[in-house]
Amino acid sequence: MATTKSTTPRRKAAQSAQERPAAQGAQFPLECPKPRQMHPSEAVVIVREISKDAVKLFVMPKPSAVRSILNETFGPLGWAERRYFADSRLWCAVGVFNPYMRDYCFKDAAALEGKHPGSPERWKEETSFVAAAELWGVGSDVMALPSIVLRADQVPIAGIQKPGRKPNDPPQVVGYKLASAPTVDKFLRNPDTGEIISVQFVDKEGRKATWEK
C-alpha cells in the first residue's frame, strides 16, 4: 500500500549561540565628544582678597561661554541642566544625551564657596552650573587654575578712605581696591598637555601683569 508523503515543511535547525551573528552593542567606555579649550576672552576675573601689598584673584569661565561650548560640542538639544537644593546648598546637574540610554546622563556639582562679588543668589546659580559643566570637560582647563596672587608692583592698588571723626582728623583707610579691574589677555599652555601654565592680565589703561604657575 502506497504511503502519502508529508507536505509539512521541516523546521530549520536552530542556530547555536556561536553561529548567530553578534548583536551590535554599546562599547564601554562610551566615547564622548571632547570640548575645546577656552579662549582668554571667555574667562572672567574675580577679586577674592586684597590688601595694600597684593591681590588674590580667581579666574573662572564665563557662564555664557560655557553654554556656547556645550552647544558647540553636544548640540543645543544634546545637553540639559537642572537645579535643586541639598545640604543647604544650591546644586546644578548638567546632562549629556546618551543615545544608548535614550536619555540624559547627569553629573552634579554644588555652588562654589568663598568671597564673591555681586548677588549671592546669582553667584550660586552661575558657579554651580560652571562646576557641573566642568565635569564634562567644559572649562576644565580654566577651573584647574589655582588662586592667583599679584603683587602691588604688578597691579595698581588704591586705598579706600573715609573722613576722620573730627574735621581736622586725617582720612582713614578702611580698605583697598584695584585702581583698574584686570581682564585675561593671554593664556600660555603646556604644548603636550594643554594645561594653562601662565596667565597674562591687562587693565583698561593697558597695563599688563603676568602670573606663572
Q: Residue locations for each model-derived region?
A:
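Strand-helix-loop interaction patch of compact alpha/beta domains
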Residues: 33-87
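Positively charged, aromatic-enriched nucleic acid-contacting surfaces
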Residues: 64-213
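N-terminal, Lys/Arg- and Ser/Thr-rich interaction peptides
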Residues: 2-56
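Flexible, active-site-adjacent loop/turn segments at secondary-structure boundaries
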Residues: 28, 58, 140-143
